[in-house]
């Protein structure tokens, strides 16, 4: 699943070519994503100039003077440029075509769990956006905040930091990596972790996410950035996808467990 670094990489890849362009048409070949793409989307957006892009958690906002296109990449989505008139493949569901017509913005989603929604309201007040927690790379995400939110919570720390109401964008890959870097077992209860260790975890989440963004995200299967290229952070992964392999610190075999139907990999020697 594309997580925050992949979404940020996508935004940075498409923004320079999008801003200032006017939409000529929207070709919707498959409207059945996580939520149905409404037939009105094309008429609402045609002729509109894109003013800027922004991100909230894993949602990309493509803004015009009239409203905002909200895009979520779901489990397997990608948003990238192709030369105009490039024939679509089976999983290429939507094309955004521009007046100058040299390139199109294409949305591809094999599993169709993503979303493309239009709103004329402030997108921060949209039902999908307004309840989200702070951005992990912002000053609002800090040790004081996390300690207060964790107090008394009897849920595993990995599950806790993956809750988008606590902090946005920390998905399975980067939760595994940040907890390893912080030396915290993923099954330790959030409410039992000291403020000092939570401060270390906050620092590690920020470091891991920033490094992943710098590498263009992590490509495990489907993801490509806005330039159509894969992310290269996979080569930096210390625990995710490395069950039973040697720990990069102590060389002991890494252990895999299941948490909330997701794979969790950690070192029983280096994480406590």
UniProtKB/Swiss-Prot annotation:
Cofactor entry: Zn(2+)
Annotated positions binding DNA: 91, 111, 153
E.C. number: 3.2.2.23, 4.2.99.18
Cofactor detail note: Binds 1 zinc ion per subunit.
Stored SUPFAM superfamilies: Glucocorticoid receptor-like (DNA-binding domain), N-terminal domain of MutM-like DNA repair proteins, S13-like H2TH domain
Active site: 2-3, 58, 262
Free-text function comment from the UniProt entry: Involved in base excision repair of DNA damaged by oxidation or by mutagenic agents. Acts as a DNA glycosylase that recognizes and removes damaged bases. Has a preference for oxidized purines, such as 7,8-dihydro-8-oxoguanine (8-oxoG). Has AP (apurinic/apyrimidinic) lyase activity and introduces nicks in the DNA strand. Cleaves the DNA backbone by beta-delta elimination to generate a single-strand break at the site of the removed base with both 3'- and 5'-phosphates.
NCBIfam families assigned: fpg, PRK01103.1
Protein name from the UniProt record: Formamidopyrimidine-DNA glycosylase
Provenance organism: Marinomonas sp. (strain MWYL1)
Encoding gene per record: mutM
């Amino acid at each position: 699943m594309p997580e925050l670094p992949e979404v940020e990489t996508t935004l940075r890849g498409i923004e320079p070519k999008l801003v200032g362009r006017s939409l000529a048409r929207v070709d919707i070949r498959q409207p059945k994503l996580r939520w149905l793409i409404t037939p009105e989307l094309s008429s609402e957006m045609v002729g509109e100039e894109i003013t800027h892009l922004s991100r909230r958690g894993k949602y990309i906002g493509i803004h015009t003077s009239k409203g905002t296109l909200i895009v979520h990449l779901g489990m397997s989505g990608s948003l990238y440029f192709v030369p105009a008139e490039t024939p679509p493949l089976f999983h290429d569901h939507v094309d955004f075509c521009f007046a100058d017509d040299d390139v199109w913005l294409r949305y591809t989603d094999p599993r169709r769990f993503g979303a493309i929604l239009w709103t004329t309201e402030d997108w921060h007040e949209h039902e999908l956006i307004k309840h989200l927690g702070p951005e992990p790379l912002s000053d609002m995400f800090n040790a004081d905040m996390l300690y207060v939110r964790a107090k008394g919570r009897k849920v595993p720390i990995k599950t806790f930091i993956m809750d988008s109401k606590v902090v946005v964008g920390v998905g399975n890959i980067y939760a595994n990596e940040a907890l390893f870097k912080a030396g915290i077992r993923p099954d330790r209860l959030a409410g039992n972790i000291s403020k000092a260790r939570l401060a270390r975890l906050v620092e590690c989440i920020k470091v891991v996410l920033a490094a992943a963004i710098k590498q263009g995200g992590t490509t495990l299967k489907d993801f490509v950035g806005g330039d159509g290229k894969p992310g290269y952070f996979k080569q930096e992964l210390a625990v995710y996808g490395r069950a039973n392999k040697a720990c990069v610190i102590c060389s002991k075999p890494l252990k895999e467990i299941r948490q909330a139907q997701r794979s969790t990999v950690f070192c029983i020697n280096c994480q406590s």
